[in-house]
Every structure is written in C-alpha cells, then in structure tokens.
C-alpha cells in the first residue's frame, strides 16, 4: 500500500496531473488507511490477544460493517443496480448513513477496548482504514455536485454523515500520532462553530448547521486546503 501511495504521488506530480480535489482526497483517505494500519489505538497490547470471545466477535462485526459501507459506496459509484438509485434512493441513502455511523462507532469502540497481540494487525483498525477509503470514494464520485453543495443548506444527510465520519477519523488518527493536545484544540474550534449564538461580545455569531459545517470542512477551505496541497 505504501509503495502504491508513493508511486501515485510521483506519477501525479511528475507525469500526469490529477484534478486537485481528487488528488487531495486520495492523499487524505489512503493516508488515513495507512495511518490506522500502522498506529494502534494505544501503546498497550494484550498478552493473550483479542482473538477469543467477545473481542473477536466485535472485531469481526466492525470489519463486516466497514466492508458493507465500502461496497455500498462502490455501488453508488458504479450505479449497480440503477433501479436502487432511481426508485429507492432515499431508502438506500438512509441505510448507508446508518450503517456508516454504526461501522465507525463499533470500530472505534473495538479498537479502544479490545487489545491485540503485539505484531498482529487489528481488524478494527483495518475497518477504520476501510471506512476512510469509503469516505474518500464517496466524495470523489460526487465531486461535481460536492463542489456546488458543500458548505450550503443543499448538502444532503449522506453528505453530512460522510464528512462527519471523515472528520472523526482524522481526529482519531491525530490523537494516535500527535496526542490529545491537537485534538482538543481542533474540538474547541469545532464547538465554536455551533456555540456562537450563546457566546458574548465579538465572539457571538449566528452559528452553523451540521450539514453546512461538516461538508464545508471537506473543501479547499478545510481539510483539502493549503496544508494538504503543499
């Protein structure tokens, strides 16, 4: 994966340029995948592993849920079958939103509470990486629409949940790599976007809806901004 990741960057930067937003989304989503595979949720490991009992079951559940999310996103991209999107799009989108949230919650809880043996890759961390890929693919396949609706009230509920999950995954990997300090700083600014109406003086503002705020974060004024473009 790492070799392919580096090869993609060399190809895009030296041979064939890739559309900027698409390049940055691939950079972020595959980077998250590699990060979750490399960095464990903590520095402690189980002497007996998490391969027995409930630990193994929860790990498997997280992997299955994340795989379902990825398959559904790929189905949207390939429009297979088209009848799902033409006649039952609302049901499909609601199901995708629900299973995506369930996948990230189960995977995070599993990675926190069930420790793996040293040297063994956790299915829960793999599941988090798969979800990161799904988020990237979802935004890429809807990029033309995303450029128009991100940060506006027109953003759909699925757009909200996918961008929210993307932010959660970025914060979690930041915690694993850099510690809680960076996460706390980021959370303060996220809370500021919603608490503005109740703040005093010059800090007061009208506030933002979740749809507007989290989808706006996945634009070139947020996650896909100058830091990633360098």
Label for each model-derived stretch:
Residues 1-154, 160-164:
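Conserved, well-structured core domains of diverse proteins
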Residues 16-23, 87-88, 147-230:
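Hydrophobic transmembrane alpha-helices of multi-pass solute/ion transporters
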């Amino acid at each position: 994966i790492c070799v392919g990741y580096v090869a993609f960057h060399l190809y895009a930067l030296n041979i064939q340029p890739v559309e900027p937003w698409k390049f940055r989304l691939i950079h972020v989503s595959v980077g998250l995948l590699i990060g979750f595979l490399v960095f464990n949720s903590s520095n402690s490991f189980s002497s007996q592993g998490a391969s027995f009992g409930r630990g193994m079951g929860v790990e498997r559940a997280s992997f299955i849920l994340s795989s379902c999310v990825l398959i559904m996103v790929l189905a949207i991209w390939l429009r297979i079958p088209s009848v799902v999107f033409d006649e039952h799009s609302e049901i499909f989108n609601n199901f995708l939103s629900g299973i995506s949230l369930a996948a990230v919650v189960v995977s995070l809880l599993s990675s926190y509470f069930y420790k793996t043996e040293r040297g063994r890759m956790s299915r829960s961390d793999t599941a988090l990486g798969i979800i990161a890929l799904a988020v990237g693919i979802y935004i890429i396949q809807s990029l033309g629409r995303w450029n128009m609706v991100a940060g506006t009230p027109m953003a759909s509920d699925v757009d909200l949940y996918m961008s929210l999950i993307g932010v959660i995954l970025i914060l979690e990997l930041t915690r694993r790599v850099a510690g809680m300090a960076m996460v706390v700083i980021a959370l303060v600014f996220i809370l500021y976007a919603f608490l503005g109406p109740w703040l005093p003086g010059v800090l007061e503002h009208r506030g933002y809806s979740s749809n507007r705020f989290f989808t706006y974060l996945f634009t070139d004024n947020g996650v896909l901004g100058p830091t990633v473009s360098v």
